[in-house]
């Protein structure tokens, strides 16, 4: 299986399965001299770990990250950084009933038909557990970005058709749904409780942004900044759509409205979402991500078995009601990885200038 590595200059490979002994990531290309501790990474990991919100699974994982290599006396050495998170609360026996059945909405059927074999205990690499490695690596990337003045953050814009109307960044940390609108957060909680009684699940929208991004990040044509952001977000299992800036709303605007007027001190608007022709403009990067409902639900569903015959399935078990808000930090981590990669690639573009100044 290929496709487990992301990035060119700042490269991340994730590894491990949901019900294996551990999951993790290897970060290759991180510059030396960046202060890095397990505690610094853990801050981001704690936002993703199970049981962190009313909509999350009852599976209890500490998600403690262990740095195995690439750090000496608290500083990165420039060599590969290996990160490991042990799985401690996997209950594989609960998946035995799915050995010969395909779960709707999961990768069971497509993996079986691609590889002729699948990990039916938790979904293997298709499990959301894989994202723990992404978040750990994204935390490392975030520390690199801090050195150049870039800050990323994410919040719940919408959950179960309840949308935040008032955006107060300080409210995000004050409610279990990471919503910037406290009134909307209360409605989200009511909606989650309602759907939980039905054994169903919810989707929503995450907004992730980056401030302090300098102009010049991104490459022409196939490696555009917005193209790589879209790829990064769409690589998250629960994500079904991405828009940047005005996004799909831009299709309804005239050019005179959609264009961002250029002023002496910047731009008047940000419909472009911080990118022009695939290169950062110096404005904030603004991304919205559509997250599908969790496919593991207690509602009876039609399916087929390995023998191809019709059957009925009820998944149940310890599953999230919604991937939100745990997926928020995953989106933030992926934006970190994209930006860290382009920061290092831009340094290569201007390398002659840097050496000439020495």
From Swiss-Prot:
Cofactor: FMNH2
Keyword Amino-acid biosynthesis belongs to the record: yes
Pfam family, one: Chorismate_synt
InterPro entries, alphabetized: Chorismate_synth, Chorismate_synth_AroC_sf, Chorismate_synthase_CS
Superkingdom of this protein's organism: Bacteria
Record field: catalytic activity: 5-O-(1-carboxyvinyl)-3-phosphoshikimate = chorismate + phosphate
Keywords assigned: Amino-acid biosynthesis, Aromatic amino acid biosynthesis, FAD, Flavoprotein, FMN, Lyase, NADP
GO cellular component assignments: cytosol
Keyword Electron transport: no
Gene Ontology molecular function, alphabetical: chorismate synthase activity; FMN binding
Residues binding NADP(+): 48
Pathway: Metabolic intermediate biosynthesis; chorismate biosynthesis; chorismate from D-erythrose 4-phosphate and phosphoenolpyruvate: step 7/7
GO biological process: amino acid biosynthetic process; aromatic amino acid family biosynthetic process; chorismate biosynthetic process
EC top class, as a word: lyase
Signal peptide limits: none
Residues binding FMN, per UniProt: 125-127, 277, 292-296, 318
Entry note: cofactor: Reduced FMN (FMNH(2)).
Enzyme Commission code(s) on record: 4.2.3.5
Chain's role: This reaction introduces a second double bond into the aromatic ring system.
Subunit structure: Homotetramer.
Family: Belongs to the chorismate synthase family.
Alphabetized PANTHER family for the sequence: CHORISMATE SYNTHASE
Protein known as: Chorismate synthase
The species this protein was found in: Desulfatibacillum aliphaticivorans
Gene name linked to the record: aroC
């Amino acid at each position: 299986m290929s496709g487990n590595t992301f990035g060119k200059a700042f490269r991340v490979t994730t590894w491990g399965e949901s019900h294996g002994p551990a999951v993790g990531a290897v970060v290759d290309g991180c510059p030396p001299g960046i202060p890095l501790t397990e505690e610094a990474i853990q801050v981001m990991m704690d936002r993703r770990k199970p049981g962190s919100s009313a909509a999350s699974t009852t599976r209890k994982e500490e998600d403690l990250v262990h740095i195995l290599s690439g750090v000496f006396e608290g500083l990165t050495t420039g060599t590969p950084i290996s990160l490991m998170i042990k799985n401690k609360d996997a209950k594989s026996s609960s998946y035995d009933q799915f050995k010969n059945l395909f779960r709707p909405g999961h990768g069971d059927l497509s993996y079986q038909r691609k590889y002729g074999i699948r990990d039916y205990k938790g979904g293997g690499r298709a499990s959301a557990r894989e994202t723990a490695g992404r978040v750990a690596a994204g935390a490392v990337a975030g520390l690199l970005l801090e050195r150049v003045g870039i800050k990323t953050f994410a919040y719940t814009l919408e959950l179960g058709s309840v949308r935040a109307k008032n955006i107060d960044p300080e409210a995000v940390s004050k409610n279990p749904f990471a919503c910037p609108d406290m009134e909307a957060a209360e409605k989200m909680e009511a909606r989650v409780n309602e759907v939980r009684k039905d054994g169903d699940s919810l989707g929503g929208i995450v907004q992730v942004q980056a401030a302090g991004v300098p102009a010049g990040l991104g490459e022409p044509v196939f490696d555009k900044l917005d193209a790589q952001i879209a790829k990064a977000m769409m690589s998250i299992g629960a994500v079904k759509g991405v828009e940047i800036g005005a996004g799909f709303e831009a299709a309804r605007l005239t050019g005179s409205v959609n264009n961002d007027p250029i002023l002496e001190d910047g731009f008047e608007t940000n419909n472009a979402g911080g990118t022009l022709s695939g290169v950062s403009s110096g404005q904030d990067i603004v991304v919205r991500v559509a997250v599908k409902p969790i496919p593991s639900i207690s509602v009876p569903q039609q399916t087929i078995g390995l023998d191809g015959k019709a059957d009925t399935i009820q998944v149940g078990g310890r599953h999230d009601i919604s991937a939100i808000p745990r997926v928020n930090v995953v989106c933030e981590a992926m934006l970190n990885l994209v930006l860290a990669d382009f920061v290092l690639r831009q340094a290569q573009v201007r390398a002659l200038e840097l050496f000439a100044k020495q």
